[in-house]
Amino acid sequence: MSGIKKEPIESDEVPQQETKNNLPSAPSEMSPLFLNKNTQKAMQSIAPILEGFSPKTSASENMSLKLPPPGIQDDHSEENLTVHDTLQRTISTALGNGNNTNTVTTSGLKKADSESKSEADPEGLSNSNIVNDADNINSISKTGSPHLPQGTMDAEQTNMGTNSVPTSSASSRKSSTSHPKPRLPKVGKIGVCAMDAKVLSKPMRHILNRLIEHGEFETVIFGDKVILDERIENWPTCDFLISFFSSGFPLDKAIKYVKLRKPFIINDLIMQKILWDRRLCLQVLEAYNVPTPPRLEISRDGGPRANEELRAKLREHGVEVKPVEEPEWKMVDDDTLEVDGKTMTKPFVEKPVDGEDHNIYIYYHSKNGGGGRRLFRKVGNKSSEFDPTLVHPRTEGSYIYEQFMDTDNFEDVKAYTIGENFCHAETRKSPVVDGIVRRNTHGKEVRYITELSDEEKTIAGKVSKAFSQMICGFDLLRVSGKSYVIDVNGFSFVKDNKAYYDSCANILRSTFIEAKKKMDMEKKNLPIIREEKEQKWVFKGLAIIIRHADRTPKQKFKHSFTSPIFISLLKGHKEEVVIRNVNDLKIVLQALRIALDEKAGNPAKIKVLANALEKKLNFPGTKIQLKPVLNKENEVEKVQFILKWGGEPTHSAKYQATELGEQMRQDFDLLNKSILQNIKIFSSSERRVLHTAQYWTRALFGADELGSDEISIRKDLLDDSNAAKDLMDKVKKKLKPLLREGKEAPPQFAWPSKMPEPYLVIKRVVELMNYHKKIMDNNFAKKDVNSMQTRWCTSEDPSLFKERWDKLFKEFNNAEKVDPSKISELYDTMKYDALHNRQFLENIFDPGLPNEAIADELGSHSLVDRYPINVLAKNNFKIIDSHSMNNSGKNSSNSVGSLGWVLESGKTSTARNPKSSSQFDEPRFMQLRELYKLAKVLFDFICPKEYGISDAEKLDIGLLTSLPLAKQILNDIGDMKNRETPACVAYFTKESHIYTLLNIIYESGIPMRIARNALPELDYLSQITFELYESTDASGQKSHSIRLKMSPGCHTQDPLDVQLDDRHYISCIPKISLTKHLDMDYVQQKLRNKFTRVIMPPKFTPVNITSPNLSFQKRKTRRKSVSVEKLKRPASSGSSSSTSVNKTLD
């Protein structure tokens, strides 16, 4: 463009600050674009505004947020501290020679006023107190900092646009011993031989950590790699062994190990085989005079099977295993079963003899309506469903038939022994009531502690003794003052009960100490030469990528303009810019008002933006993104103006992140405690991500171990990337037609086969949205909405609730015009309100009784009565495949969950059951529940496709978005491999990097245990982990393996049903293995083979400006300076050395 007065800026110099003198003083300096009268008038109106600010680029690049040193706070102020209160901020610029860093530090530490907490923000975590984005940091002093060890970086980084950025390295935390726990004389070593998923479960972690905290015991976790791949001669030796069967566990192998090493065992491994056959369990219980319900048996398999070893054990307990012939049986009538002359009348319970088969049927008497109920492993919030066609017993397989008993209070009792003299018991709602599972915030079934009667305590002791299981769970029924055992579950712990954890640890401690005394006496009397074996595979390192915790719904308005007024806001940049500072947002608001006055664009669009920006101006996290569109001459022809707000961390985020940090600390204490000495933490610059990283870090190290560690900002790795924008836009254009009438989804779209086509689902959602809009408007007009909910999260109120929903109602008022990108906003909002505004949700969408006429247009039936549910969610995020981990020959096509999704019943009863778990089970909320279900379906099958529909698109978008992060992770793992001590690197980021990184992994060709279309929703705090293990052979040669895991995060299938407390948070689902243990070089090569598929653009993150320049002055030399990788510091800085900075200048 000609005719522009240029201000010369040296191409090798970064301006530290632009002043008012840099700004145009009159419209005569502007581009010919501005020569028409309206434009001149508009720019003359803007000119006075420009006198009040100094445009400059942000100085923040990569930076570190430091946790405070110990002792700056007392315990009583803990709850009042926010991220801002507990972080020191440093901005680091690595000099070009790489020998030192300059660190700019601001203390910014202050004690929060506890009296300032509002009723709406009981945790003192209002968003106004949370640390601002990394861009809004002012520095006041400089301090020296020793150079940090540089991670292994390869030549590939020259393609990723980050070779001038500091590598993933940060100072390591050194644990403090300001409050050391008392140390006691060492007793011995506890070996834990069980599948990792069980060993690292919450109860096991708590109990083992209690055992080792005073130094009496050390633990050795055998681990899946050793258990499955190593010979028992190479398994580590121990004094005491905790071992038990679960899916995939090689029980016979563990039995051979016990015979070889003879450790003290708390649960007899051979006797655990009894639990596989319900017939044997019942025979053992009878031998010990434990009451059980009356029963009949139909064995079509020849009876229970047992090897000689197990037969010998059973004989010791008075049970003889004999072959059994198939009995004569018949149904005398529809209600009476006869087996070998003995009869049983309905209702009765039909149980498979296989102890691992939970498909249990209950048959009801015809006089009570007939039919039956199918019980199954808990799926989401269901554990059973009624089937009116269930009349005749199954004729294939072997079954036990027990007389059905009406239990007291419709409850079952779950009992947990720790030896013969201790038993903890809890009640739960029986699954036969309505099949609805009540869950707490940890995702566990709601239970209540109950006191056992003397008779029940005696029963518990007999169960523990009969099965030779010190730790053993079993189920009781209480019927008219008597108790009956109906199932024995074997090794199991109580969940989420600290008193139980304490009791269990104390009893185990005493047991182990007594056992060690006997073992030592035996050694004295009969010296035994024991071979000592250390752990074969040692946990060496961890790279973990974590999505941020719970947030408010993200909202935005997006419009495009060609007016020079909007183009001038770019400050001459030709890439995306971001504006966050409140003063700068005020200037943009003034520009919008001027543009409205001068009709510089569609008035309706401008008015929407101006009104929204005025309301949200002071909201934390409000920002404007300006995305230029260039013509063939590389000049800006229009600007996409995007106003965003929301997406702020909620009060729940603190609890979620803290809990995850505590869990990881417990894992490290068990796997390799020395890893805590070398942990590096990185975060994107967004507030919700920083907030998560900070609370996770504090919990990981403990309040008494805060040191000088840093949370380092890595925008280049973890912030939004524009590199895949064009490709993602193309994919989004493909998604729109799929939602239109008559369009069938392509095969790779993976739409559930038995669901109506996407258009019909969208159409129904639009109908439901229109219906609920009328209800909400009616209730706002006729009811006192301010009294519906007394406490609000994140400073909301009824008007803001209505504003959010009104925006969604406009987006979903026409099935032909629904934008696929709005589906995530709908699902986001619905999930948020189900957790944080449930009381208001219930009241504002209450259609009233009797139902009003507006309900007639919907009809009385749902679109479908069976909804797709993720296979992993169906199995409670457990991989139910006993062979998958033993059969290395299986490829990914046979991996668990290859079908991905199955249909589950979504029917609800027509009348609310008094024992029902949720107010939303009432018929008047049938449409609201349907809306939630259908929004979930659309979210699951539409939103992940924004990152690619075809495999090629998924890989390309994945690489363009997360290639720098993927490369850095491999560099980190290589660095860990070469270290003598273990290490951990944690990356905190947002959803897009989680999905795209997973797509890279899946497209790399690494054999996976979970098919990609079986991956569940990746919710808040979802994680991807790379675990590194090391083995050293006799010659000193080292081998390394990698195992990939993932967690779906803080997820619930049914947010309307989960029972909440005031914290409104859902716990994190434990990690599940994506792969077996694989050779490290193999994994790295598989991933690197895909890296060369794309070439990263020289710049792929948005410019962040602190003050928009409304003059639209073209500055070619400035753009030139932005594009270079090495920029010299001005001479005034006192250094002539070049500075290596991030290519992205803010």
Curated annotation (Swiss-Prot):
Cited Pfam families: His_Phos_2, PPIP5K2_N, RimK
EC numbers for this chain: 2.7.4.24
Chain intervals for the UniProt region annotation (Polyphosphoinositide-binding domain): 530-597
Gene Ontology, cellular component aspect: cytoplasm; cytoskeleton; cytosol
Positions carrying Phosphoserine: 31, 54, 77, 895, 1107
Keywords: ATP-binding, Cytoplasm, Cytoskeleton, Kinase, Nucleotide-binding, Phosphoprotein, Transferase
GO molecular function: 5-diphosphoinositol pentakisphosphate 1-kinase activity; ATP binding; diphosphoinositol pentakisphosphate kinase activity; inositol hexakisphosphate 1-kinase activity; inositol hexakisphosphate 3-kinase activity; inositol hexakisphosphate 4-kinase activity; inositol hexakisphosphate 6-kinase activity; inositol hexakisphosphate kinase activity
Keyword rRNA-binding: no
Stretches the record annotates as Disordered: 1-33, 93-185, 1106-1146
Biological processes annotated in GO: inositol metabolic process; inositol phosphate biosynthetic process; regulation of bipolar cell growth; regulation of microtubule cytoskeleton organization
Positions with a binding annotation for ATP: 278, 351, 358, 377, 402-405, 412-414, 430, 475, 487-489
InterPro entries: ATP-grasp_RimK-type (IPR013651), His_Pase_clade-2 (IPR000560), His_Pase_VIP1 (IPR037446), His_PPase_superfam (IPR029033), VIP1_N (IPR040557)
Compositional bias of kind Polar residues: 16-25, 125-144
Enzyme class: transferase
Composition skew (Low complexity), residue ranges: 96-106, 164-178
Binding positions for substrate per the UniProt entry: 197-198, 377-378, 414, 428, 492-495
Biased composition range(s): Basic and acidic residues: 110-120
Localization per Swiss-Prot or TrEMBL: Cytoplasm; Cytoplasm, Cytoskeleton
Catalytic activity: 1D-myo-inositol hexakisphosphate + ATP = 1-diphospho-1D-myo-inositol 2,3,4,5,6-pentakisphosphate + ADP; 5-diphospho-1D-myo-inositol 1,2,3,4,6-pentakisphosphate + ATP + H(+) = 1,5-bis(diphospho)-1D-myo-inositol 2,3,4,6-tetrakisphosphate + ADP
Reported function: Bifunctional inositol kinase that acts in concert with the IP6K kinases to synthesize the diphosphate group-containing inositol pyrophosphates diphosphoinositol pentakisphosphate, PP-InsP5, and bis-diphosphoinositol tetrakisphosphate, (PP)2-InsP4. Phosphorylates inositol hexakisphosphate (InsP6) at position 1 to produce PP-InsP5 which is in turn phosphorylated by IP6Ks to produce (PP)2-InsP4. Alternatively, phosphorylates PP-InsP5 at position 1, produced by IP6Ks from InsP6, to produce (PP)2-InsP4.
Family: Belongs to the histidine acid phosphatase family. VIP1 subfamily.
Description of its domains: The N-terminal kinase domain produces inositol polyphosphates. The C-terminal acid phosphatase-like domain binds inositol polyphosphates and negatively regulates their accumulation. The C-terminal domain reduces the amount of inositol pyrophosphates in a dose-dependent manner in vitro.
PANTHER family tied to this protein: DIPHOSPHOINOSITOL PENTAKISPHOSPHATE KINASE (PTHR12750), INOSITOL HEXAKISPHOSPHATE AND DIPHOSPHOINOSITOL-PENTAKISPHOSPHATE KINASE (PTHR12750:SF9)
Note: Present with 8810 molecules/cell in log phase SD medium.
Official protein name in the record: Inositol hexakisphosphate and diphosphoinositol-pentakisphosphate kinase
Name of encoding gene: VIP1
